[in-house]
Amino acid sequence: MHQVRTPARLIRVTLVVTVLGILPARAEAPAPPLGAYNADIKESSISGISSGAFMAVQFGVSWSSIVKGVGVIAGGPYYCAQGTAIDGLLGNLGPALTATGPCMKGPPPDLEPLFKKADEWARGGDIDDPHNIANQHIYIFTGYNDSIVNPKVADAAYRFYLHYLGGHSNANIFYQSAIGAGHSQVTVNYGQPCNKNEGDFIDHCNYDQAGIILQHIYGALNSKNRGALSGKLIAFDQRELTSPESPGSYSMAETGYVYVPSSCAALQPCRVHIALHGCKQNFETVQDRYIRHAGYNEWADTNRLIILYPQTIVGNPATDPFTPLNPFGCWDWWGYTNFNYAVKAGRQITTIKAMLDRLTSGHVPILAEAADAAAPSGIVVNDVSNTGAAIAWTPAAGAQTYTVNRASGSDNSFAPIGSVSGPSFGDLGLRPATPYRYKVTATLSAGTEGPSSPVVTATTLPVPPRCDTAGSCPIP
């Protein structure tokens, strides 16, 4: 009979546990697998704040063939940090320094290498053709009190998208820089004062950012639910979606979350929006405060939208050698997981795509019915800045394109200013503190033009105050 020798280290650990009266904790039961719903993957969209914004851009560029729109809150251009496999082999810190330097504090890097890399990866099949971006609806936001990501970085994101959208005349993009927010997800009335750059990074500025993003992407929506929500916030197992690797090796949590309205749970036709938290906003750090209070669920509840909340973890190789260094729970936009981080094969992009595939795997296609040209309905002013206005409307059945007409001043004559294929329009290059009137007509594939929508008036904001010290500048 062999004598089993107990290692001395185990004896010491056992003694400590016994002396302190600590009982071994039972492992928590894993969350259930992510469910499947009747959602069309080509109606999917994504948004994020800070590192989540950089990841949203990466995902939207990598999978541009299926992503309908992208919301970029306090983020920058695609592949901004420019981390490469050579950096990884040599242990270079360059990408991390670029991420925390030019890609946050500015001035941002030259965009030409980023365009060349995106085009190179597209030719090799590592990402979708970036010219698909011309069909996406893009919302970019920088608060002038943001002391963490310089507004010049958001300017670079705007210029990156303009390159693929075809220039300033493309009305699929809207850039908001006239709100005095700090580095934050911005809400109407939840969170810290508007100019803060700390805490949970959710600031209240009387600005419904989640709703504005969703309406810029999908058109005018039903009013959000201001009462008890009908749906459920569901925890799901992220481990099966990184298998055979552990989620920790991707700096992702074992559990993610998804908000599913009752209509989507009943398998009515739905759409998916992916909402990515920023650094220091994951569940491990702020519990469910971002998930419940970012503002998406209230809009989702009345508009058949599923909101996916993937989760990162704080990573420290000193305590877990299989976890990459990620002290603030950021998404990987500089190469801390590996140097495929910005393409389809990136570990986190692959996992988020697997989540999206699962959620949309119950989709039942519906044949479109022929319809007469009708006036777009429900037209709303979705957002205004000091130099722009964003309008949205409910899609008209059978419409192939929409023509937006504008009038200003005392002149009541409307002139066409552009055509779009989707139900929203970003009108930039306007004068501050000036009213503009808009109406929209729909055109069918045969060229038949329908009647005009009702007229809405958007008044642009005044020029924001000069802000030399972000975080302390006045908010009108």
Show which residues each predicted segment covers.
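Cap/lid segment of the alpha/beta-hydrolase catalytic domain
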Residues: 32-34, 81-100, 188-199, 281-290, ...
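Primarily recognizes the serine-hydrolase "nucleophile elbow" in alpha/beta-hydrolase
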Residues: 40-91, 122-124, 222
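The feature captures the conserved acid-bearing segment of alpha/beta-hydrolase catalytic domains
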Residues: 80-164, 168-173, 213, 260, ...
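N-terminal cap/lid segment of alpha/beta-hydrolase-fold proteins
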Residues: 103-121, 220-267
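Short beta-strand element of the alpha/beta-hydrolase
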Residues: 268-278
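Pro/Thr/Ser/Gly-rich low-complexity, intrinsically disordered linker/stalk tracts
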Residues: 369-398, 432, 447-467
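Extracellular low-complexity, O-glycosylation-prone stalks/linkers
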Residues: 398-416, 439
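Beta-strand-rich modules
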Residues: 427-446
